Amino acid sequence: MKRHLNTSYRLVWNHITGTLVVASELARSRGKRTGVAVALSLAAVTSVPALAADTVVQAGETVNGGTLANHDNQIVFGSTNGMTISTGLELGPDSEENTGGQWIQNGGIAGNTTVTTNGRQVVLEGGTASDTVIRDGGGQSLNGLAVNTTLNNRGEQWVHEGGVATGTIINRDGYQSVKSGGLATGTIINTGAEGGPDSENVSSGQMVGGTAESTTINKNGRQVIWSSGVARDTLIYAGGDQTVHGHALNTTLNGGYQYVHKDGLALNTVINEGGWQVVKAGGAVGNTTINQNGELRVHAGGEATAVTQNTGGALVTSTAATVTGTNRLGHFSVGNGMADNVVLENGGRLDVLEGHSAQNTLVDDGGTLAVSAGGKATDVTITSGGALIADSGATVEGTNASGKFSIDGISGQASGLLLENGGSFTVNAGGLASNTTVGHRGTLTLAAGGSLSGRTQLSKGASMVLNGDVVSTGDIVNAGEIRFDNQTTPDAALSRAVAKSNSPVTFHKLTTSNLTGQGGTINMRVSLDGSNASDQLVINGGQATGKTWLAFTNVGNSNLGVATTGQGIRVVDAQNGATTEEGAFALSRPLQAGAFNYTLNRDSDEDWYLRSENAYRAEVPLYASMLTQAMDYDRTLANSRSHQTGINSENNSVRLSIQGGHLGHDNSGGIARGATPESSGSYGLVRLEGD
């Protein structure tokens, strides 16, 4: 597909045919084609045996209706109305090698034209086309003026140097290319972004290498501004987007998206509710205003200066970006690995990377502060609804809704953390978290060798993940979820699916002085295929009270269940005089494997065990008896054919069979010894046949 940046056309008198012939010229960096080249082109045209029909609409003349096809040319010095054009693009869109179509000269006017498959309308300098509909692969090449053009279903408009398109509407799969020196004003874009935000799609929508002004981008619409392009006063609604490689000025995002790529520049963008401005590495923006529920994202290597962040506006960035501006605290800055006075709310997030730092950070409702290991954040204020993401290798200190908190990245000790709303903290090996509160959508993760002290409180919707043996010297209060995990067995992680039988599984222990259940759950792994191994909860010297649900995932062979022996599989171990209340634990869901059901039992030693039931699962005898019962029924059905009453006539016969009875088998030794299980059933059938 050829879309040359500068193609111009002129009429030349052909003395051989005695007619005007259209000649195209390309303005390239090396200059125009020579007159010899034009002459050769005309000579080639005159050598065609059958010449296309050319008509000329003279100045002052008006032509109403008509169709152009088969490489016909219509040269318009006067005016036309209601023409249909279906020729001129047989050799590809906007190619100078094409012949045929409608040519609107200086002073010529074409109105209400329909350009359809393979059709081409060429509007030369000084010519005007109005109310044109271009569809099904037709195109309009513009060096003059086009007003109120509609592009439908692969309809294309090419605005060349000196050309002006105003009021163009680009519908599904339509395409407008504004080339260097071209101008498009008042364009409405309804296509180009069907593949998703910032997707690789340059075959529909508006491509700007020249200038686009006062553009409206609706849902599914896209405007791409190339490096030579400028877009001014663009309005983008939800579901529409703008890709900036050149310059975008005075853009308003009413739920729409603006993506500023490397070497792109956007100035004076206003981000309203639902809108995003994304500044990628090497991109730059200036004087952006973030209003409530709007969002500015600045990637590492991106730059945003003179930003105005109003209340409820979100800033998403990291200490590898450059951002300066004002917020409700005053002046703020991010750059050179340091952040100061940043406000995070309503989806905002600041990532403090290794070796970088942040100070005076306000994490308000919906905001997130993430501090990597080796990063440092001081004077942090986290209000209710704010989130902190860190591990014991980070250094963080400040206040939250519960009071003062701190993380010492050197010692690995943390105190007074409040984790909620997507916040998380990881206690690495050798680290310690004391007096931790995990709220709704908060996560506390402990590596092997991590430990807890004081009171660890898990609210409803909170999670604690154990990746190894963990010891708590204090109390655990659980209204959320505690999950034993195994980083080497993704099959069993998070999803609680049954792990592959050959997956390596390492079982872990959680040891705590006291456990108070508040309707929370502990998710444990168990092998029911004979190894009798399980994760284990150890109550050391204290007590287990309240109500805790135990949920087990069988990580052994899911088809093989083995009867337990002795006391069963110990899952709760009360040590050093610890006690467990009757009813402190219960199964959250049935546990089955192979032929067995398993139950949770408390023994006199205060420990809790999984045991297989003496009776097989109800499905086992049913499955074992199905074959015998089916064979009995088949024999009965076959024998029934001998018990029929019939009526015969010369041309037809009717047969009726009615039968009922009882089928059953006595217990003759039990299915454990291979016998058919005891079963009993009745049957009845009526069969009517005719031919």
Question: Language-model segments: what does each one mean?
Answer:
Residues E613-D691:
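Outer membrane beta-barrel translocator domains of Type V secretion systems
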